[in-house]
A protein has these predicted regions:
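Contiguous, well-folded functional domains in the mature portion of proteins
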Residues: 2-171
């Protein structure tokens, strides 16, 4: 052990603490919460991909609902996958059938492999273009590995701001 080794140990980065459960996913858009069964797409409304809810956006920005890493970022820009802290797998899907827009109206701010923090801007969308294309713009947040958890519960209703509590995940 060298004389200055204690300095190296002191400056080593701290290991991030494991998240405590229940873990709360934040609202990823400004707007009005849409219950899962009212999402205008049967795959989401029936919970086939996992428990979810939507937000009918009033602004064209989508933010990270959880700390994690971007695992999916298709070129179309209409969806993102995040491996969140605590093993929570999140799919953010912007709009219904918006994949048909082939990226027009979507401006992703992240790419696959990027680390994100809750509240980081993930993408911008042109709500007018989405409406003109005839698609609902609802921002859908899905916990795709719902079955890995004891509970996944939507805790918000009415109007929400980005960062407000949206979904509670219990282990």
């Amino acid at each position: 052990m060298g004389f200055f080794d204690f300095l190296k140990k002191a400056s080593a980065p701290a290991t991030p603490a494991e998240p405590t459960f229940p873990l709360t996913l934040a609202a990823d858009a400004k707007g009005t919460v849409v219950a899962m069964e009212n999402i205008p797409d049967e795959v989401f409304a029936q919970g086939i991909l996992g428990k979810c809810c939507g937000i009918e956006p009033t602004e064209g920005k989508v933010f990270a609902p959880v700390d994690g890493e971007i695992t999916q970022a298709p070129d179309s820009g209409h969806a993102l996958g995040i491996m969140g802290v605590g093993g929570v797998e999140v799919l953010i899907h912007v709009g219904v059938d918006t994949v048909e827009m082939k990226g027009d109206g979507f401006s992703p701010k992240v790419k696959e492999g990027d680390k994100v923090k809750k509240g980081d801007l993930l993408l911008e969308m042109d709500l007018d273009k989405i409406a003109a294309a005839g698609h609902p713009a609802v921002v859908i947040t899905v916990v795709t590995n719902t079955d890995d958890f004891k509970g996944v519960e939507v805790v918000a209703s009415g109007d929400v701001e980005p960062g407000a509590d949206l979904i509670k995940v219990s282990k």
